[in-house]
Amino acid sequence: MIDVTVAEAACGHLHEAAQLSRDDPNRTGALLTFGSAGQVVMTGDMHGHLGNFKKLQRFCALERSPGRSVILHELIHQEPEASDQPDLSIDLLVQVAAWKCQFPDNVFLLQSNHELAQLRGQEITKGGRSVLRDFEQGVALRYEAQAETVLAAVYEYFASLPLAARTANGVFMSHSLPDPLAFDVFDEAVFEREPTADDLAPGGSAYSLVWGRFHSADAVEYLAQRWGVEAFLIGHTPQEDGYARVGRLLILASDHAHGVFLPIDLSRKYTVDELERNIRKFVSVE
């Protein structure tokens, strides 16, 4: 693990990770694509959980597994165990950025509603607290006089993130999916371009993608047929047991002791039943 407390190093990792994200050879517009060789590991919301991140690194073992890729999203806005504890999810964010720099061909990040809200200054409250303010205070606690410089690097990083990933075997991965009521107005061309300010604002298709909820099995099936998808993997909605299934949709959570992740062999087709059976719990990782 790197020393996350050095502002210059943190900014360096964040700036480099942002550039790698923008220039990713797997990326066209706002979509990452993966072929039919190797493995992709999909995670759920992580919200500052360093323990599960360390287990993810051990499982992926990228230093000896060049054919394995890993996708992360929603890293920030940790839920403190007590009201007087700081949100230090900046630590996870910097660790993941450093991992991206170390393994640029293996580590991938997607846009999420919390990262987007922090970038846009759009308030989110949990239990009466402002998670944006708590995150900024955590950055100030960690980096003191250099906090604003680090925050600028954080926002550059958030602005660089793609929206989704798709595999040759029919798996679509994103932070969430549009609300069913927005299906008819959702602009699917958003995946083909760099997201604009309008895309990322309320009413935009990128915003709709990362904030969507209320997905029924029928709605998921409709979207699967429309987009030619075998299975959707997302996060966004909290899952106390680690995951939930809604038809072709699997919702993963990686931010607590019952958190999960999902390894996918890219060389074969999967049913959703098979994908569900492949879900791994972080507690199973030594």
Language-model features: locations:
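Feature recognizes metal-dependent phosphohydrolase scaffolds
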Residues: 1-286
